[in-house]
Amino acid sequence: GIPEGKLNVAYPVIESFRRYIEYNDIKVEVYIDKGVPLGVGLGSSGATAAATAVALNELFGTGLSIGDLIALAGEGERAVAGEAHYDNVSASILGGIVIVNPKNPREFFRVEPHNLEVVLFLSKSRGAMKTRSMRQVLPRGIDLSTTVYWNWTVSKFTRALIENDLKSLGEAISEGGIVEEIRARYVDSYWEIKKAALESGALGFNISGAGPSMFAICRSGQGHRVLLEVKRRMNVEEYLELLVTSIDLHGARVLS
């Protein structure tokens, strides 16, 4: 289930907010109706942290900038991963696809992709893999030639986003390198599922977050075909839930 009290990622966000506005005498109760499965690589902790930051800003009328909200929500991620990181919280706050400076969360840009569907391969093993532990299995460094290649891949990804070049975007997403190679060891039938999805028309495929869930991107209208073809080829429904969705363009918002 969802951790309570100080163990929940909402708590450090509240504490950071309290320090930020320099007003300690505030008391809030946070009730979480979790719509995102826990510990499967979908950014569930980031979703909670982002929603908490946005809700506090609205509740107290503090008028924090988007960059401030991202920095604030990142403190919730610190509790989960051992260090603040802003990729999930920035996208949860802003919607769309967000590229954010890992050293300065107030520096970011946002892109709205068009004509894109996402096929999610959700692990039914809830809470099986934690961000912190899946970071620990990665190497501490990579060689120069690999670094140069990954700079190219990131550049390709960014250009494809800006130009809405879905073919190039899919190619860049599919290039997971050493991170994909290592984390794939912890995902059942990963390479077989990836091959089936790409051969069925997916433009790109990779592990979602720290795993073990996966995702594929497709042109609009192609997602269900990919989903059905992967199901036809492989018996994945015992351990995966498959669904087709799109990228939310609104981000965290007040509902009532």
Language model: regions and residue ranges:
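Anionic-ligand binding region
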Residues: 98, 102-108, 126-160
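Glycine-rich, charge-dense phosphate/pyrophosphate-binding loop(s)
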Residues: 161-256
